[in-house]
Amino acid sequence: MPREIITCQVGQCGNQIGMEFWKQLCMEHGINPEGILEDFAVNGEDRKDVFFYQADDEHYVPRAVLIDLEPRVINGIQKSAYSSLYNPENIYIAKHGGGAGNNWGRGYTDAEKVQDEILEMIDREADGSDSLEGFVLTHSIAGGTGSGFGSYLLERLNDHYPKKLIQTYSVFPIENDVVVQPYNCLLSIKRLTLNADCVVVLDNNALTSIAVDRLKILQPTFSQINSIVSTVMAASTTTLRYPGYMNNDMVGLIASLVPTPRCHFLMTGYTPLSLDQKFNSVRKTTVLDVMRRLLQTKNIMVTGAVKKGAYMSILNVIQGDVDPTQVHKSLQRIRERKLANFIPWGPASIQVALSKKSPYIDSGHKVSGLMLANHTGIRSIFKVLYDQYRTFRKRDAYMNIFKQTKIFEDNLDEFDSSDEVVKSLIDEYAAAEKMDYINWGNDDDDMQFDPREPPKFSNIQ
C-alpha cells in the first residue's frame, strides 16, 4: 500500500522549486499539465498515489499546500499551463500581500496569526490519505517567508503530527544574497535541527557552480537552478514512486542515512546532469562510472563540504537497466581505491538502491545516479553562517529590524537559544569524526539530547 506524503511549499523559492518538482513528476508518471493521465500511461506500474490523489473526475491532484506572503510566484503558477493541476483550496496568499520583508520575525509572526487556516488545509489533506507517512517542506532559509513561516510550520507539524516524518529540501543562500540572512539562517537552522527528521541541504553557491562549470551556462537563471533541484528531488523520491525491494518508503530511506537524531543534514550529488537532452555528454554510462562520479567534489551540491571530514552514510539511488552484479563489482572497486573516507565508529559501506526509470521520458543515457550522503563536512556551511551571525551580533547590526516583531519585542532570547543549538550542531558533526563520539556530550549537564538516542522514525510502525 502506498504511504502518502504531503508537500508544503513555503515562500518564493519554496514554490518555485515545488513547481519544477511537480512538472517533473507529471512527466515521469505520464500526467499532462491538467492532471489527466495520458493514454500511453494507463497501465503503469508506478505509485502515483504517494504524491497525487485522484479527484472525482479522475484527474490527478498533487498532495500539496502552497503558501506565500506575497502573490507574485503563486499567481505565476496559477497563470501557467499547470494552473488547473493544484487544489485551489490548498493555496494560501497573505491578504496584505506585502511579503515578510526578508525578516524571519515577520514570517514567523504572520504564520502564527494564520496557523488555524494553514493547519486546516494540511489536516484536510491528511484526512484524505489512507496511510500518511510524512511531510516534505520546500523553502529557502535566507529570506523572510521560507525561513520564518517555514520555521513556524515545522514546529506546528512536529506538535500536530508527532509520529509522522518531516523531510525538508532547504535552499542555503548565496553570500550577501540578503543583508540580514545570517540572522534568518541561524534561526531557521535551529528549527531544522530540532523539528525535522531529515534535511536535504541545497547550497545555492554549489548549484550555481555546477550550472556554470558542468552545464556551461554563463549566467544561470533561477529557473535553470530550480530545474537542477527538481531533478534531485525527483530522483530522491524515485524508490517511493517506482518501488523495488528496498528503500520503498520514507522511513527506510531516512533510517539508512541518519545514525543519530541531530546529524540528519544530507548533501546530494547527481550524474549525468543535463537541462537539455541535446547537450547530453557523449559517453557510455556504466554503474561504476556513475558511482565514481558521484563521489567527485565537483558533482556534490554543497560547496567544499567533502574536502575534509568523513562520510557517516551514503545511499546511491541508481536508475536504469542495471545488472546487480555490476553494482557489487563497482562497490569492490570503490573500496579498493579508497574513494570514500568513512567515520571510524560505523560501517564503512555504500548502500545502493536500484530503481526503475520512468518509461515516459527519454533521458538519453542508460544509467543515472543520485547520491544522498551524510558527511561531517556539512558543518562547514553551518560554520560560515554561524560566524557571519556572530560578527553581526557583536555589533548589534540590523537588530532593530527584528525588535519590531512580536517574538523579539521583549528580549532576544530566541537568538541566544538558536546560537546554542547551531553551535552544538557544529560541535557534534566535528565530534562524529572521532572514535569516542558515542560518549560525546555525556559530561554536559545542559545537553538537551543524547546522541545515542534512536531517531524518532526508528519507532514508527
Swiss-Prot record:
Q: Where located?
A: Cytoplasm, Cytoskeleton, Microtubule organizing center, Centrosome
Listed A to Z, the keywords are: Cytoplasm, Cytoskeleton, GTP-binding, Microtubule, Nucleotide-binding
Q: What is its main location?
A: cytoplasm
Q: For binding GTP, which residues are annotated in this chain's numbering?
A: 142-148
What GO annotations for molecular function exist for this entry? GTP binding
Which SMART domains did the record assign? Answer: Tubulin, Tubulin_C
> To which protein family does this belong?
Belongs to the tubulin family.
Biological role stated in the UniProt entry: Tubulin is the major constituent of microtubules. The gamma chain is found at microtubule organizing centers (MTOC) such as the spindle poles or the centrosome, suggesting that it is involved in the minus-end nucleation of microtubule assembly.
Q: What is this protein called?
A: Tubulin gamma-1 chain
Source species: Euplotoides octocarinatus (Freshwater ciliate)
